[in-house]
């Protein structure tokens, strides 16, 4: 192993897609540029296909050449957890940075980290996107407690997450650090050029709803707001850019019932990283 301090990241990264994977890869690059040796332990299986609500879990971009990524963790195979735990125990990195956003991950991560902790060297830091999930299920608290006992300290991504930790009685060091600005999606594009790239023929105000769509995201409330006569009179349009993780019929019905067909532009798809700048520049 290198003489540089070593960080292992546990959580989604390539070939998996999404905001957490993108964040983890960007963070690893930042640590590498600061002199750390970084290894990314991603999933060999993240979710069984029948549990995943989207079209695919996988990115369509090329594999990053500047990151050391290992597809190692199978979230539903306890024998795999033991194997990965023993491997990381022997590796003895200085730090493990683990992402936590869903109690489903607690058995795998909690078991792996317990085994790693036996080396009495590696410190485990959790970046907590959520501690209490948006969509609650029986057993969530028990699973999160199992995970928590294997963690040395937390970074909370919002004041709400920090509050949720107190609610659950988590008595570990917690640092509140808000989500940094992403700077790896390319430079901004002139507004009308961005709209042309997306095929949007509109000169007026443009609002953007970006990201996958589930009930707790509030798109139904935004569509209700778009029906306000003041919004219509000022010529605003709404771009919805993201994949539906639930039946879209509810939302298409709202669009029709509020007579928003001419105000809503829908991109029902996962937006790849190279296109993201166009959506934010167009709005």
Protein language model regions, located:
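A short helix/loop element that forms part of the nucleotide-sugar donor recognition site in Leloir-type
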Residues: 186-200, 253-255
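N-terminal strand-loop element at the rim of the active site
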Residues: 13-17, 29-90, 161, 166, ...
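Short alpha-helical donor nucleotide-sugar binding micro-motif in glycosyltransferases
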Residues: 148, 277-283
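A conserved, positively charged/aromatic
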Residues: 32, 117-118, 132-152
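Glycosyltransferase donor-sugar binding loop
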Residues: 43-47, 235-252, 269
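Donor nucleotide-sugar binding/catalytic pocket of nucleotide-sugar-dependent glycosyltransferases
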Residues: 149-188
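Active-site donor-binding acidic/aromatic loop of nucleotide-activated sugar
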Residues: 246-250, 261-272, 279
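Conserved donor-binding/catalytic core segment of Leloir-type glycosyltransferases
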Residues: 200-217, 223-226, 239
């Amino acid at each position: 192993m290198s003489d540089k301090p070593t960080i292992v990241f546990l959580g989604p990264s390539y070939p998996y897609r999404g905001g957490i994977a993108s964040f983890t890869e960007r963070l690893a690059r930042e640590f590498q540029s600061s002199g750390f040796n970084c290894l990314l332990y991603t999933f060999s299986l993240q979710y069984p296909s029948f549990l995943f609500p989207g079209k695919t879990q996988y990115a369509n971009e090329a594999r990053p050449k500047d990151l050391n990524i290992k597809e190692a963790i199978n979230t539903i195979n306890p024998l795999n957890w033991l194997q990965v735990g023993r491997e990381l125990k022997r590796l003895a990195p200085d730090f493990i940075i683990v992402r936590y956003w869903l109690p489903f991950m607690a058995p795998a991560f909690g078991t792996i980290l317990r085994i790693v902790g036996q080396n009495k060297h590696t410190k485990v830091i959790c970046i907590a996107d959520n501690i209490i999930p948006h969509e609650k299920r029986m057993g969530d608290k028990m699973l999160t407690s199992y995970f928590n006992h294997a963690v040395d300290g937390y970074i909370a991504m919002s004041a709400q997450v920090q509050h949720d930790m107190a609610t659950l009685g988590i008595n570990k060091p917690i640092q509140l650090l808000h989500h940094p600005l992403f700077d790896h999606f390319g430079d901004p594009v002139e507004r009308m050029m961005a709209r042309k790239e997306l095929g949007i023929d509109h000169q007026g105000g443009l609002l953007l709803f970006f990201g996958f769509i589930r009930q707790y995201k509030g798109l139904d409330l935004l569509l209700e707001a778009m029906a306000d006569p003041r919004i219509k009179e000022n010529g605003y349009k709404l771009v919805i850019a993201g994949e539906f993780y639930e039946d879209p019929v509810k939302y298409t019905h709202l669009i029709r019932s509020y007579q928003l067909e001419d105000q809503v532009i829908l991109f029902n798809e996962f937006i790849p990283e190279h296109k993201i700048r166009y959506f934010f520049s167009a709005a």
